C-alpha cells in the first residue's frame, strides 16, 4: 500500500469519527479496505463493531497487534479540509492513525508470509465504555489466542521518528467518577425551608482536595480531577440537586482503592452534615498498562538498531488505556509514536504529522518480520 493510499485512508477515517460501540461506518471502511488486500492467508471475523483478522504465518506462534477505532465527543477545530463530518465528534486521540497503521501492516503481511501467525484486533470503545475487557470476557478470540500482543499510541509531544516505551508500568489505573447530590429545593428567600445542594457540593469539592495530599504515599502517584460541576436552575432558586463528574488516576491499584474509600467516607460525612443523599458511580474503570519487561527490553533493543528511529526511555504516565486488559491476559508491549503536534491528545485542534504513519509501518514491519517465538 503506497503512502498516498494510507493518507487517503487516514483522512477517510478522520471524517467519520464514531463513539464507542457505534463505529458502524468505521467498521465498514475497515472491511472494505481489507477486502481489497490479498486474501490467501487471511481469515476475518467480526464482533459487534470490532474486526479481527488472522494472517497465517510459518510458525505455530501468534502475535497480536491491536488498534482502537472510536472517536471522542469533541467538536473539531483543526480547519482541515477533511475535518469530521459528524457534528460533535472527532478523532482527537489518534485512533484514525492507529487504524491506518494497522491496515498498512496487514496489507504488507497479506502478501508477504510472516514468520509467526499475526492477529490484527480492531477494537471499539477504547474511550468508553471500554472494548478490550468485553472482548476478553466474551472469549471472542476463541482459538485465535495470541502468545504476545503489541499496540502503539500517538504522542504529540514527541518528534516524528521517535518511539518511546519502558518495561513494567507505563499507564495508570483509571476510573470515571460521577457523583449526584439530592437535597430539597426552595425559594432563595427561605433557605431554612430548603436543603441547598450547591453548598453541599462545594464542601465536597473542597474536602476532596485532601484525598491525595494526605492519604497517598508521596512516593506513589494519584490524581483526582473534578472536571464538571452542575447544580441549580435559576439564580433565586435553591438547588435540590447537584452533580460532579471527574476522573481518578493512580499508578497502583492499592492507591485506587484508598482514593475510592476516602471519597466514600467524605460523601458519608457530607450526607450527615447536610441531611442529603449522595450517590457515587465509578463508571468505566481501566487497569494499568503494564509492559512485559522481557518483551519491552527486546522491543527497545530492536528499535535502537533502526536507522531513522530515535528511541526514548518513556516515563510512567497518568494516561488511561484499556489495552491494559489485554496485557493482563497476554504478555506484550504498548509504545508511544512521535507525531509532533502543537496540540495535545483530546484537543479539538490535534494535528499529528502524517509522516509518522509510514515510519510506524516500516518499523513494525521490520520488527514483526524479525520476530521469533519466545
UniProtKB/Swiss-Prot annotation:
SUPFAM superfamilies named among the record's database cross-references: Bacterial exopeptidase dimerisation domain, Zn-dependent exopeptidases
Catalytic activity entry: N-acetyl-(2S,6S)-2,6-diaminopimelate + H2O = (2S,6S)-2,6-diaminopimelate + acetate
A Pfam family this chain is assigned to: M20_dimer
Biological process terms in GO annotation: diaminopimelate biosynthetic process; lysine biosynthetic process via diaminopimelate
Pathway: Amino-acid biosynthesis; L-lysine biosynthesis via DAP pathway; LL-2,6-diaminopimelate from (S)-tetrahydrodipicolinate (acetylase route): step 3/3
Alphabetized UniProt keyword annotations: Amino-acid biosynthesis, Diaminopimelate biosynthesis, Hydrolase, Lysine biosynthesis
MF terms in GO: N-acetyldiaminopimelate deacetylase activity
InterPro entries documented for this protein: AcetylDAP_deacetylase (IPR023905), Amidohydrolase (IPR017439), Bact_exopeptidase_dim_dom (IPR036264), Peptidase_M20 (IPR002933), Peptidase_M20_dimer (IPR011650)
EC numbers: 3.5.1.47
Cystines in this chain: none
General function of this protein: Catalyzes the conversion of N-acetyl-diaminopimelate to diaminopimelate and acetate.
Family of the protein in this entry: Belongs to the peptidase M20A family. N-acetyldiaminopimelate deacetylase subfamily.
Name recorded for this polypeptide: N-acetyldiaminopimelate deacetylase
Species the sequence originates in: Shouchella clausii (strain KSM-K16)
Amino acid at each position: 500500500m503506497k503512502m498516498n493510499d494510507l493518507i487517503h485512508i487516514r483522512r477517510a477515517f478522520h471524517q467519520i469519527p464514531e463513539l464507542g460501540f457505534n463505529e458502524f461506518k468505521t467498521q465498514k471502511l475497515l472491511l472494505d479496505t481489507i477486502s481489497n488486500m490479498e486474501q490467501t492467508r487471511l481469515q476475518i471475523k467480526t464482533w459487534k463493531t470490532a474486526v479481527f483478522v488472522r494472517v497465517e504465518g510459518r510458525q505455530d506462534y501468534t502475535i497480536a497487534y491491536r488498534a482502537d477505532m472510536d472517536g471522542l465527543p469533541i467538536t473539531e477545530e483543526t480547519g482541515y479540509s477533511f475535518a469530521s463530518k459528524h457534528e460533535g465528534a472527532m478523532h482527537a486521540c489518534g485512533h484514525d492513525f492507529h487504524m491506518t497503521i494497522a491496515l498498512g501492516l496487514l496489507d504488507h503481511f497479506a502478501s508477504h508470509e510472516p514468520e509467526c501467525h499475526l492477529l490484527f484486533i480492531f477494537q471499539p470503545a477504547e474511550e468508553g465504555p471500554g472494548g478490550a475487557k468485553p472482548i476478553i470476557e466474551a472469549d471472542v478470540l476463541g482459538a485465535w489466542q495470541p502468545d504476545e500482543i503489541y499496540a502503539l499510541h500517538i504522542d504529540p509531544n514527541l518528534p516524528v521518528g521517535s518511539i518511546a516505551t519502558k518495561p513494567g508500568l507505563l499507564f495508570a489505573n483509571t476510573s470515571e467518577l460521577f457523583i449526584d447530590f439530592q437535597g430539597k429545593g426552595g425559594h432563595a428567600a427561605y433557605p431554612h425551608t430548603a436543603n441547598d445542594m450547591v453548598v453541599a457540593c462545594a464542601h465536597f469539592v473542597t474536602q476532596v482536595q485532601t484525598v491525595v495530599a494526605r492519604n497517598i504515599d508521596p512516593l506513589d502517584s494519584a490524581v483526582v480531577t473534578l472536571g464538571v460541576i452542575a447544580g441549580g436552575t435559576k439564580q433565586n432558586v435553591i438547588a435540590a440537586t447537584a452533580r460532579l463528574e471527574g476522573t481518578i488516576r493512580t499508578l497502583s491499584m492499592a492507591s485506587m482503592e484508598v482514593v475510592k474509600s476516602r471519597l466514600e467516607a467524605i460523601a458519608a460525612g457530607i450526607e450527615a452534615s447536610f441531611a442529603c443523599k449522595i450517590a457515587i458511580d465509578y463508571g468505566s474503570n481501566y487497569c494499568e498498562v503494564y509492559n512485559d519487561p522481557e518483551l519491552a527490553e527486546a522491543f527497545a533493543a530492536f528499535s535502537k538498531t533502526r536507522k531513522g528511529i530515535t528511541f526514548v526511555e518513556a516515563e510512567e504516565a497518568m494516561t488511561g488505556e484499556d489495552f491494559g486488559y489485554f496485557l493482563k491476559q497476554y504478555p506484550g508491549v504498548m509504545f508511544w509514536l512521535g507525531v509532533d503536534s502543537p496540540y495535545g491528545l483530546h484537543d479539538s485542534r490535534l494535528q499529528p504529522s502524517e509522516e509518522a504513519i509510514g515510519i510506524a509501518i516500516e518499523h513494525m514491519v521490520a520488527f514483526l518480520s524479525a520476530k521469533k517465538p519466545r
